[in-house]
A protein has these predicted regions:
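Alpha-helix initiation/capping motif
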Residues: 29, 33, 37, 59, ...
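ATP-dependent adenylation/nucleotidyltransferase module used to activate substrates
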Residues: 1-70, 75-78, 83, 106-114, ...
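Low-complexity, flexible helical/coil segments
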Residues: 21-26, 49-56, 90-99, 108-110, ...
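Catalytic subdomain that performs nucleotidyl-dependent activation
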Residues: 63-136, 140-143
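The feature marks non-catalytic terminal segments
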Residues: 117-183
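Short, basic, helix/turn surface patches
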Residues: 39-51, 85-91, 140-159
Length: 183
């Protein structure tokens, strides 16, 4: 908490602190990352509504977005992305925004260093151990960029350039009576 207070003073921010024991609640779960993200977002929405707010802003950046795209492709077999802005389905009149959506992680780190800002590491045990799927995706993207310059940008660009005529679910094939799912 000392780093949070340091940054608060440095940036002259008026903040309110709220504590939750979400990490304890998801420890030992089969899919702790997904559950933790849902619980943290729910806690933020609840507190925002309680304070009379209509938006929550999350710090997801460009690198988070492309890591999420790859995780969805590789682990869930679906093409989807995290949106920069969306309306909550569970909290009426609430909206989620991601103002850093197009900002690279390295640029955020440079900004923090230049302005002598210090941020706390995630308290998540999976992140601390460096064993989570997001870390693996980060490593994969770095490897792809070593071999294919701009691979990270093209992953993001693919979200804008979806050709629906080449997506199997959008075409009715006479010779396929039921969808084929590879297992």
């Amino acid at each position: 908490l000392d780093l949070i207070h340091y940054n608060k003073e440095k940036l002259n921010l008026n903040i309110k602190e709220f504590q939750y024991n979400i990490f304890d609640q998801v420890d030992g779960e089969k899919n702790p990352c997904y559950l933790c993200a849902r619980k943290r977002r729910g806690a933020l929405y609840n507190k925002a509504q309680e304070l009379g707010c209509n938006k929550i802003a999350l710090g997801h950046h460009f690198d988070d977005v492309i890591e999420t795209i790859l995780m969805s492709l590789i682990f869930n077999g679906e093409f989807k992305t995290m949106m920069p802005k969306l309306k909550s389905t569970n909290f009426k009149k609430m909206e989620l925004i991601r103002p850093l959506y197009f900002v690279r992680e390295k640029d955020i780190i440079s900004f923090c260093k230049y302005n002598d800002l210090h941020f706390i590491d995630c308290a998540c045990s999976v992140t601390k151990k460096g064993i989570g799927m997001r870390k693996k995706m980060k490593d994969l993207i770095n490897t792809l960029n070593e071999y294919y310059r701009g691979a990270d940008k093209n992953i993001m660009n693919a979200t804008y350039n979806v050709n629906l005529n080449t997506i199997i679910s959008s075409i009715n094939y006479i010779f396929i009576s039921t969808p084929i799912i590879l297992i």
